[in-house]
Structures are given as structure tokens and as C-alpha cells.
Amino acid sequence: LIRHFGSLRTIWSASAVALDKALAEVGGRGCESCGEGGWAVGAAIVAARHLAEAAAREALVGEAVDTRTPEFRHYLVRRLGLRREECVMILYFTGEGLFIAEDFYSSGQRGEVVIPLRRTVRRAFDLDARRLVVAHNHPSGSALPSDADVAATARMRAVVEALEVGLDDHCIVAGNAIASMRSMGLM
């Protein structure tokens, strides 16, 4: 797999289909109990990734969340740091900062991510969320916010705050690096 994907990070972020295809190309062994042509290795790697994400999410539950804490940053890296396509996550919190839920959106394109404002506002009201955090990744490797990121954040902040929902931060993840637009003075 390393020969095919080039690194453990790339293996970790690959889909089960891509993993199984790579295994088939190098004569990997299938899982006889998985059915005709079934592969268990790709599914097991993806399941392990989901388990690691759930364990990181668990650290957010039950306590007020601060975007500067190592636990929160670890969670964002787990969810977004290795993805090859730009994705956006909206995290919903109570007024006291307790984690309620998250929504995950993928644009499937590099260099562009759209924050779904209508869906975000509707979901915030459905959850009775009082605070939001936006996070998205830059597969390019630079966590620095673009001009488009700054403009989208300002637009979102104006919309949600007019509806009495706070936008606490917009974090950008690139690999293991995270930039907080709030900490950078961009919000």
C-alpha cells in the first residue's frame, strides 16, 4: 500500500474502494467471507479512521469547547487534515459552549469551498444552537486563510449574528497545521 499511495497519511485518507483496488493491483489477499471479490483490509482501515475520529469527538462532549485547546485542534486534524478535497465542517454549540452536533460538507474541488448559509442557519435553529465554529481544510498544505475565506467568514458572521447566533471562529486545517481566523484578528 505504501508503494501505491506513497505514505501512511495518504493510505489513512483513502477510501475503502481505493484501498481495495490498490491491494488487487499488487495481488493482495481478499476476504473469502466477505463475498465474491470482497476485501476486508480497505474496510478495516476506513473503520479504524472512523473510530479514531469518534474518539477525538468524544473529547469535545460534556465540556465547554475552546477552539484553542489541543483536544479541539486534534479533532479538526483528525476530521480534515488528511482529506484531498476541500471540505467544510460546521460545529454547533450551546450558549455555554457545549458541543451539540456537526455537519460535514465536501465540495469535491480543490481551491474552493462553499459555506452553506441557509442550511447552517436552519440547522442552528433546529438544534437551538447559540454558537458556531466553521472549519475547513486546505489540501494545498497552507493553513493561511485566503481572501475568499476572509470574505465568506465576514458574510457568514453578519448573517448568523443578525439572527442571534455567534460565530466563534473559523479554523483552517492543512495537514497538522491549524490557523484560527479569530486568533489572527480576522474576525
List each model region and its residues:
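Long amphipathic alpha-helical segments
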Residues: 1-61
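Short, intrinsically disordered/low-complexity patches at protein termini
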Residues: 20-23, 64-68, 123-126
